[in-house]
Design a protein with these regions (language model features):
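Bacterial Sec-dependent N-terminal signal peptides
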Residues: 1-22
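Intrinsically disordered, low-complexity regions enriched for glutamine and histidine
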Residues: 16-18, 38, 776
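Beta-propeller blade termini and top-face loops
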Residues: 21-772
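Residue-level detector of functionally pivotal "anchor" positions at catalytic/ligand-binding pockets or at interdomain
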Residues: 768-784
Length: 785
């Protein structure tokens, strides 16, 4: 363990001055500077060389946004992978092994990458996922390597936050085009299409349609690199609504330049009007460049949803739009015609193409040797061999939700696909596939829970997969833990879990938007039981967060708490329920949409008194009850901002102490919000101290040392050994999203759930053994009452 206290003190002194002002962090430049501070902290941290051990799962990969390759020419393909939240990965042996090559750059979310046609060692990477997901994140501009990924240089555009496409001039590598949809949650001017002619030293914005409109796709004519087509989309994402195209949106469409972006012409003939054009993918037929395709998420209403009809998540179904529609031009974009959905059979097929979330997809490719062979990416890979008139699925054996594809221009049978399960390869035009799962450890965990079995087990939910568990085997030594295959358990892709400590078998799991179920680990799924009533009579509709908080009482595990817009309590293990709070959110009717919002996002109970509960909401409210729910008091106070409450921890060492973290991700705010109260929430102090960068997702106390706190953020893990006065980077994790963490109280192992790199464990002995002591300073009940 490193001892660098003097250097730490200097750095802390510098950063503490910066942290006194709690303004939101809204610019990419600020975020980059904050990450530089994080790396400086890592270098001087007393705990920076502790090793996080990868726990798996080796049988699950994660979402990728793009894939490109360099043809073999007598050797193996070199494959480059852009992941949604795991950085960039490279294989020099056609997928036998992959290595991360973009680990400490201030972000791990990648929107697109491009390999230079003139020099395969030159690769451009655009950070910030352009697909809008519940876990998509903002990036910090574009980067370039000239040595095959050994070193990287930041090349600007950090204010774009997202990148959807990068194109490099085939003959002049200094000419590069970068498309950005812009900020996901807020309006900004740094979006559209950018061009550099000097390798990234200077940029010019060459296509811009307003602070809500960005460029989602572009393609270059293989005959003339000055001819480009670009698609724009005016998108609005709200915390309570999926992104969509509205009737007042006038900036959606397809644009063409013939002079390298100096001037643009909108292409409209035969295409839907602007207010119906959602996300649009475009591609050119290399074999006949006059043929151009547009894959449009068409927002024209196809039919009205019936009353009581539900979507795939059990929410009220919205009116059904026309959705995935393919258009074709045979005259280089001058005129277009719809080619898909012209028969009832084709219309039915295309209606299920993208599920209910077409804005997530919007990618298509044309076979480089056949202008009539077209691939569109949705839930599955869909192929047409007749120019879009009919489609059929291929690759149904690989993971769903397709986001990227690369076809070898010299061998169109060789296809690489990027999807929510990683990367897959086909050598026969999609008839057969092989997936790189253990080779790409990219699992996107949302949560972690443990039990007290021997060996202990950990549980977690994984984006677009399910919920899983595994054993943590310490028998070979605390520093020799091996990654494992994980097994299915109760839950869904976004869940919280609670394990009954009396049997280490009964498991409770929240599921989509507030649903709750119970089972046993050994008998699942056969004994799964749904627990919650549909609605309480006086409530119009129950609202539950994507991961609604569920809590088993530490005083009596038969008592179960569950957070919707109000707190529910069961005293018989979930058999019956009563509501013990009013609606704790602002309950603004203008913010009720098709995404559950204005819900409880955090919940905790004091181990000292079962009547003391804390609850926080996604719209920034914070509450306390001292009498088991009979009366609730709002304890949000200045200087707290109105931000999503990401975690509440009632101290297990001191009765009156409670910790709260807030995340500004959905406000494009990377500020660090960490608060402590020592008087039950009557007053709050900022203990973010020298933590340089957020957002903050979780805080935990060490169960055996009352002075130690752990913090999980969007760049890694921090530890404080003095109750939050000073923080240090903990361990050798790469830059990664830490969505949850826990400390096993018996085995003293720290567990982190990362959203992009799987799950890790760390031996906590070097951190807390010298600090462990008897609990002290417990507030008496008299002070509480």
């Amino acid at each position: 363990m490193k001892r660098k206290s003097a250097a730490i003190a200097v750095l802390i002194s510098t950063l503490s001055v910066q942290s006194q002002v709690k303004a939101p962090v809204l610019t990419g430049a600020e975020k980059l500077n904050m990450y530089v501070s994080h790396e400086q902290m890592r270098e001087v941290s007393a705990y920076g060389d502790l090793h996080w051990q990868y726990l798996g799962p080796v049988n699950i990969s994660g979402r990728c946004t793009d894939v490109e390759a360099v043809g073999p020419k007598g050797k193996s393909y070199t494959i480059w992978v852009a992941s949604a939240s795991s950085g960039v990965w490279k294989s020099v042996n056609e997928g036998v092994t992959f290595e991360p090559v973009f680990e400490h750059k201030g972000t791990s979310t990648i929107g697109d990458l491009a390999v230079c046609p003139a020099d395969p060692d030159v690769v451009w990477v655009g950070t910030g996922e352009a697909n809008i997901f519940r876990s998509s994140n903002a990036g910090c501009g574009v980067w370039k390597t000239t040595d095959g990924g050994k070193t990287w240089t930041h090349m600007g555009l950090e204010e774009t936050f997202t990148v959807s496409r990068i194109l490099i001039h085939p003959e002049d590598p200094d000419i590069v085009y970068v498309a950005s949809p812009g900020h996901e949650w807020t309006r900004n001017k740094e979006r559209g299409l950018f061009k550099t002619t000097d390798g990234g030293n200077h940029w010019e914005k060459i296509l811009y349609k307003g602070p809500e409109s960005g460029v989602n796709d572009m393609v270059m004519d293989p005959r003339d690199p000055d001819v480009l087509y670009a698609s724009t989309w005016q998108r609005t994402r709200l915390k309570w609504n999926d992104p969509r195209t509205y009737e007042h949106h006038k900036n959606n469409g397809i644009w063409k330049t013939v002079d390298g972006g100096k001037s643009w012409k909108q292409l409209t003939r035969g295409l839907p009007p602007s207010q119906y054009m959602g996300r649009t993918g475009i591609d050119i037929a290399r074999s006949d460049p006059a043929v151009v395709y547009a894959f449009v998420d068409d927002y024209e209403i196809a039919y009205k949803a019936e009353e009581g009809e539900l979507d795939s998540y059990g929410r009220p179904k919205q009116d059904v739009i026309k959705g995935a529609t393919l258009y074709r031009s045979d005259d280089a974009g001058e005129s277009w015609r719809q080619v898909s959905g012209l028969t009832e059979e084709s219309k039915k097929y295309m209606s299920g193409h993208s599920g209910t979330y077409g804005w997530v997809f919007g990618q298509m490719r044309v076979d480089p040797s056949d202008a009539d062979r077209v691939y569109t990416l949705g839930l599955y890979i869909n192929v047409s061999t007749d120019g879009g008139a009919t489609f059929g699925p291929i690759g149904k054996s690989i993971h769903v939700d397709q986001h990227g594809m690369w076809i070898d221009p010299d061998n169109s049978g060789y296809i690489l696909a990027a999807h929510d399960g990683g990367i897959s390869v086909s050598y026969d035009r999609g008839a057969n596939w092989r997936s790189f799962i253990p080779e790409l450890p990219l699992a996107q965990f949302y949560n972690v829970e443990y039990d007290m079995s021997e060996p202990f087990r950990v549980f977690g939910s994984v984006q677009d997969h399910h919920s899983f568990y595994t054993e943590v085997d310490l028998s070979r030594g605390r520093d020799k833990i091996r990654p494992t295959e994980w097994e299915y358990t109760l839950g869904a892709e976004g869940s919280t879990h609670q394990i009954d400590p009396r049997d280490n078998s009964t498991i409770f799991a929240s599921l989509f938007y507030g649903k709750l179920a119970r089972a046993t680990v050994e008998e699942y799924p056969d004994d799964r039981e749904w627990l919650l009533p549909e609605n309480f009579p006086e409530e119009p509709e129950a609202r539950g967060q994507w991961m609604a908080p569920t809590l088993l009482s530490s005083h009596n595990p038969d008592i179960v708490y569950h957070g919707l817009q109000y707190v529910l309590k069961s005293t018989d293990g979930g058999g019956t329920w009563k509501k013990i709070s009013p609606d704790l959110t602002f309950n603004d009717p203008e913010k009720i949409g098709d995404i559950s919002y204005q819900t409880i996002s955090a919940l905790d109970e004091s181990i000292f008194n079962s009547d003391l509960l804390y609850a926080g909401t996604d719209d920034g409210r914070l509450w306390r009850t001292k009498n088991g729910g009979e009366r609730w008091e709002e304890i949000w106070k200045d200087p707290m901002p109105v931000r999503w409450i990401s975690r509440i921890v009632a101290s297990q060492h001191d009765f009156g102490t409670v910790y709260v973290t807030q995340t500004g991700r959905r406000d494009d705010d990377a500020q660090v919000y960490v608060w402590r109260s020592q008087d039950f929430g009557n007053s709050w102090e900022d203990i973010a101290s020298n933590v340089p960068t957020g957002p903050v997702n979780v805080i935990r106390e060490d169960p055996g040392a009352d002075s130690i706190l752990y913090l999980g953020t969007d760049v890694g893990v921090y530890v404080s050994t003095d109750r939050g006065q000073e923080w240090q980077v903990l361990g050798d994790l790469p830059c990664t999203y830490v969505h949850d963490l826990a400390i096993h109280p018996r085995d003293n192992m720290l567990i982190v759930a990362t959203h992009g790199r799987g799950m890790f464990v760390l031996d906590a002995d070097p951190v807390n053994c010298e600090n462990k002591k008897e609990d002290s300073g417990q507030t008496k009940n008299g002070d509480f009452l």
